[in-house]
Amino acid sequence: MAKKLSRRFKEALAKVDQDKAYEPLEALNLLKETATAKFDETAEVHVRLGIDPKYTDQQLRTTVTFPKGTGQTVRVAVIARGEKVQEASSAGADIVGSEELIDEIQNGMMDFEVLIATPDMMPKVAKLGRLLGPRGLMPSPKGGTVTTDLAAAIQEFKAGKQEFRADRTGIVHVMFGKASFTAEDLLVNLKALQETIDRNRPSGAKGRYWRTVFVSASMGPSIQVDVNSLRDLKVTEA
């Protein structure tokens, strides 16, 4: 059965030319214009890449640091032992523990957006893989969430660092700010993501790497961004 569209969504949809790939700044102004919910909507980007992640040399998993932040309060949990527990608490971690925290998570406690672990705890954390993996929360060295430098990692994730990966169809889904951000600040963040994706191009990627880029507010319609314009763009963070 076809989903009935709300009047608010139909009005927002009417502002978007579905056959057009917009210049990046124009697309982001349109994202703000079509964010008409009664709350501050999240700015989302969906990038289709020319990769097949079933092959290990075509997988993409890395982190991006958004210069303008994400506009979200990020709750960070840390699994460590000994003096590292106090180090994590002092650095601003919201939840810190050792084996008891692993047990709590195994029993369903998921009150965090980022989970960091020290390398010596990973053999014990490994049993959480089936629970955390599908949620994108499993600590990994590549994602910057397995580390001995807890203070730096906590501060970076609190400030807007975000881990992302291409899904099984080769699409990257990332939240890169809030609709209340200026279009210029959203553009700085979007450009940071584009450069990160280019920098981390999988070695096995063949042919055209970038296929399509769409942005939207979380409750708004999709807006296509001109890929070449985004990649050619030079932005300043000021």
Swiss-Prot record:
Record's function text: Binds directly to 23S rRNA. The L1 stalk is quite mobile in the ribosome, and is involved in E site tRNA release.
Any one GO cellular component localisation term in the record: large ribosomal subunit
HAMAP family hit by this protein: Ribosomal_uL1_B
Sequence similarity: Belongs to the universal ribosomal protein uL1 family.
Subunit structure: Part of the 50S ribosomal subunit.
NCBIfam families for this protein: rplA_bact
InterPro entries hit by this protein: Ribosom_uL1_bac-type, Ribosomal_uL1, Ribosomal_uL1-like, Ribosomal_uL1/biogenesis, Ribosomal_uL1_3-a/b-sand, Ribosomal_uL1_CS
PANTHER family, per database record: 54S RIBOSOMAL PROTEIN L1, MITOCHONDRIAL (PTHR36427), LARGE RIBOSOMAL SUBUNIT PROTEIN UL1M (PTHR36427:SF3)
SS bond list: none
Listed GO MF terms: rRNA binding; structural constituent of ribosome; tRNA binding
Keywords: Repressor, Ribonucleoprotein, Ribosomal protein, RNA-binding, rRNA-binding, Translation regulation, tRNA-binding
Name of this protein: Large ribosomal subunit protein uL1
Tagged with keyword Glycosyltransferase: no
Annotated Pfam families: Ribosomal_L1
GO biological process: regulation of translation; translation
